[in-house]
């Protein structure tokens, strides 16, 4: 049967593309994997190996009661080639899953090259194939030619080329004795949490922003950043003048804590905030909140230090830090199903950072699902979605159902998982219950989904 099936095409040999190609081949479906290196070089890569780790050698926390660790364990149970190879080449790193990155990538390259159903093409592919089943896994440094092709396919407004994202905070870590729920001038639904500042708090915050240490943009990001004047980092606004932030994202006009009375009453004039940091709901459950207008290029440690100076955010737990860097990604809620198929063309799938997930393990998870579903499409089977109670299922449901207007790339985190039926106060215990529920539901799903066994 395998000889009669046309090959699936996978474009991109990073973590997502490598995982996708492996899952397709392991399901007994031939696959052609395109990787442009070394014929065409990338500004971030140093080798021609598959799944090269271009930043850290760490896949994040290893413990399964942490978000990254739970995703590792889910992928282990789903026979991910990325995670099994990472386990094989693990190096000491405290509580993290870290690898010998050179040996890790070389081993994966060899595994794919030796698989009888994988055809490895080292050449750029600058057009999306018009026929057949294809997985796009070209990553944040997608070539200009293929990016243009994607723009034509998706529409210009549905692609981003520079990621300027604000931090995202766990809702329960926000002090709501200080933060208040309101919309400006009480218009519409009270959709924002607001953190008020008095003059002294504002001046101290501005001074800390101006002095905080910034991350360095890489050489290949500098040119893109020049065109980003319309979305300036918060620290640049702070440097431009004492009141620049107060007339921008920290504008206090029309925002008042109703618990203090009627904001229109003359006796309450002195209670009106001098500046306000707004937080916008990021997910359906209201467990995650985005700091509006706080795109930043500060180092992550500095972000935590400075942003915790904001009243109400003293104990803020960040699930994503603010970033400003080169990152080609799709507006996935507008374009993709939770199966990672394009809505307008179900035989085209996408995975990795291109779909708006963050991190090595999330890229592998996207490759697993896109590859599995590409193989199922080739075999005439219905594509799968994972339970939302799993980290994988929650992540892909988020990128499918988040607000298209405010979509930002998202890393694995417990804030996107549906809440428990009964509240568990201890965070450590709660994350352990999330883990137990996830792995139980994953095992049941595996039994019921009847995923076809490998044919090779």
Swiss-Prot record:
It catalyses: uridine(54) in tRNA + (6R)-5,10-methylene-5,6,7,8-tetrahydrofolate + NADH + H(+) = 5-methyluridine(54) in tRNA + (6S)-5,6,7,8-tetrahydrofolate + NAD(+); uridine(54) in tRNA + (6R)-5,10-methylene-5,6,7,8-tetrahydrofolate + NADPH + H(+) = 5-methyluridine(54) in tRNA + (6S)-5,6,7,8-tetrahydrofolate + NADP(+). GO terms for biological process: tRNA methylation; tRNA wobble uridine modification. It is found in: Cytoplasm. FAD binds at residues 12-17. Pfam families: GIDA (PF01134). The keyword Flavoprotein applies. InterPro entries: FAD/NAD-bd_sf, MnmG-rel, MnmG-rel_CS, MnmG_N, TrmFO. The keyword Cytoplasm applies. Its cofactor is FAD. Keywords: Cytoplasm, FAD, Flavoprotein, Methyltransferase, NAD, NADP, Transferase, tRNA processing. SUPFAM superfamilies: FAD/NAD(P)-binding domain (SSF51905). One of its GO terms (molecular function) is flavin adenine dinucleotide binding. GO terms for cellular component: cytosol. Its EC number is 2.1.1.74. Belongs to the MnmG family. TrmFO subfamily. Catalyzes the folate-dependent formation of 5-methyl-uridine at position 54 (M-5-U54) in all tRNAs. PANTHER family: GLUCOSE INHIBITED DIVISION PROTEIN A, METHYLENETETRAHYDROFOLATE--TRNA-(URACIL-5-)-METHYLTRANSFERASE TRMFO. This is Methylenetetrahydrofolate--tRNA-(uracil-5-)-methyltransferase TrmFO.
């Amino acid at each position: 049967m395998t000889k009669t099936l046309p090959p699936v095409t996978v474009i991109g040999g990073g973590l997502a593309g490598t995982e996708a190609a492996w899952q397709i081949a392991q399901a007994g479906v031939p696959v052609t994997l395109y990787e442009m290196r070394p014929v065409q070089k990338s500004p971030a890569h140093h080798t021609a190996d598959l799944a090269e780790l271009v930043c850290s050698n760490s896949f994040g926390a290893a413990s399964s009661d942490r978000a990254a660790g739970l995703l590792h364990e889910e992928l282990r149970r789903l026979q991910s080639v990325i995670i099994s190879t990472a386990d094989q080449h693990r190096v000491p790193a405290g509580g993290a899953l870290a690898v010998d990155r050179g040996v890790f990538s070389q081993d994966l390259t060899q595994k794919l090259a030796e698989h009888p159903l994988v055809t490895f093409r080292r050449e750029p592919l600058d057009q999306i194939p018009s026929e057949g089943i294809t997985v796009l896994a070209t990553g944040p440094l997608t070539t200009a030619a293929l990016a243009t092709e994607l723009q034509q396919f998706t529409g210009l407004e549905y692609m981003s080329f520079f990621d300027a994202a604000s931090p995202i905070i766990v809702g329960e870590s926000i002090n709501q004795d200080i933060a208040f729920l309101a919309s400006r001038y009480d218009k519409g639904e009270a959709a924002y949490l607001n953190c008020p500042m008095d003059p002294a708090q504002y001046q101290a915050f501005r001074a800390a922003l101006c002095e905080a240490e910034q991350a360095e943009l890489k050489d290949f990001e500098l040119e893109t950043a020049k065109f980003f004047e319309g979305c300036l980092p918060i620290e640049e606004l702070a440097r431009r003048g004492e009141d620049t932030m107060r007339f921008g994202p920290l504008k206090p006009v029309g925002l008042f804590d109703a618990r203090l009375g009627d904001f229109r009453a003359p006796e309450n004039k002195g209670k009106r905030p001098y500046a306000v940091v707004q937080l916008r709901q990021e997910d359906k459950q209201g467990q995650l909140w985005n700091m509006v207008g706080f795109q930043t290029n500060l180092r992550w440690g500095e972000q935590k230090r400075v942003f915790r100076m904001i009243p109400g955010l003293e104990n803020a737990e960040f699930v994503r830090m603010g970033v400003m860097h080169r990152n080609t990604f799709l507006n996935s809620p507008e374009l993709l199903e939770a199966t990672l198929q394009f809505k307008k063309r179900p035989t085209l799938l996408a995975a990795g950072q291109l779909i708006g997930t963050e991190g090595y393990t999330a890229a592998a998870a996207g490759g697993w699902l896109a590859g599995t579903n590409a193989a199922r499409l080739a075999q005439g089977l219905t594509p799968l979605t994972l339970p939302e109670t799993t980290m994988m299922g929650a992540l892909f449901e988020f990128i499918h159902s988040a607000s298209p207007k405010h979509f930002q790339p998202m890393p694995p985190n417990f804030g996107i998982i549906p809440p428990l039926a009964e509240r568990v106060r201890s965070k450590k215990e709660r994350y352990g219950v999330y883990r137990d529920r996830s792995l139980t539901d994953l095992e049941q799903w595996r039994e019921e989904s009847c995923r076809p066994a490998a044919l090779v």
